[in-house]
Amino acid sequence: PAADAAGSLQKVEVTGSRIEQTDTQSDAITNVQTQGVDEGGIVKKLGDYLIVLRRGRIFSIEAGKSALRPVSSINAYGPGISPGGAWYDEMLISGRTIVVIGYSYARGGTEIGLFHIDEAGKLHYRSTYHMRSNDYFSSRNYASRLIGKQLIFYSPMEVNLYGDSSNSLPAVRAWQQKPGAFKRILPATEIYQTGLSTDGYDLTLHSVTTCDISERSTLDCRAKAVLGPGSRVFYVSADA
């Protein structure tokens, strides 16, 4: 089966700088700007395993011995989901939960995939969530962060002043073969304004969404947002 095709991984090349860690830091943290705040990346470490996100697939590789050994591989998207028009380019790990963040141009939103890695390094699919969002891509930054068991990510929404404004508000739904209704995650009391002058053609709702990660297949999310011009810089600290 495709999910067990670990043998198809013939060669893995990883480049980057070495990051010194203390015994108190999470083993999964391999890419940070701020201590204690993990960033989305394509290579993570969990115990003796390297977890690699590459070309729409997740690979687990045993690295605790004298040689690398492919263990398991799985699609970075759920069963029945077409990867066409989608980019899966960010991965984080909380406990034994692997989170893959992607953007689908075909479905028009952010995809959040939840996977599980067991003690033997085998990968299992759990669930996928679809969040309303415009493209968050930045050549200088990742969109997601992880602090403990809280997933935090940024997503912009262009505000349509001449149509249904509810479609401009952040909302989440669980992926199913027959898509269900979106659940709004941004209350009106959590929308703020910058005070900067802007016109209706450059009005963006910059939302920061926080989701609680657990060993279950569910994802509980809530959002805050700032209304202002399209330009932005995204930064997350451990205590603010």
Put a short name on every predicted segment:
Residues 1-240:
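Beta-sheet-rich non-transmembrane sensory/scaffold domains
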